[in-house]
Amino acid sequence: MYYLALNPAVQSKLQEELDEALGRESDPIASSEIVKRLPYLGAVINEALRLYSLSSMGLPRIVPEGGVQVSGKFFPEGTVLSVPSYTIHRDPEIWGNDVEAFRPERWLEQDQAGIQKTFNPFSYGPRSVTIKIRNCFAEGSNQIDSC
């Protein structure tokens, strides 16, 4: 909601998508089937979670037997490696030069398979939790301008 308040154009675009989807239904509460078909809602939620993940820590992994080479550096077996989500979510090579900007459109412009590999706002299981957030948002906030 913070980013929607700061970005009236994003708020308007999202409100249009919600109005269009919910305007066709007799029930003002969106079903999960409707929510799945709201790409801009998903982009807004993902972009907010990219910038402010609920978990900033990465998932630690132990280097297997024989060690591993990562970006030209060797790590011996038993070494614990982890990359914080904060760092991954702000990599300009993945997200573009405007990495610090709240820009949901990046989720609609870029290769979804590629960015999903690096999008990890909850340390694990991002898709299932993101779907729950989308459902809660659509069910409880179909009037964005009143938030």
Residue ranges and their predicted role:
Residues 66-70:
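Short acidic-hydrophobic surface loop/beta-edge motif
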Residues 1-17, 132-147:
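Cytochrome P450 catalytic-core helices
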Residues 28-33, 71, 82, 89, ...:
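Cytochrome P450 heme-thiolate "Cys pocket" and heme-binding signature region
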Residues 27, 61, 91-96, 115:
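A generic "cationic amphipathic patch" detector
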Residues 12, 83-111:
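Conserved cytochrome P450 K-helix/beta-meander segment immediately N-terminal to the heme-binding cysteine loop
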Residues 59-65:
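Short, structured beta-strand/loop micro-motifs enriched in basic residues and often containing a Trp
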Residues 3-55, 71, 76-79, 101, ...:
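Cytochrome P450 I-helix active-site segment
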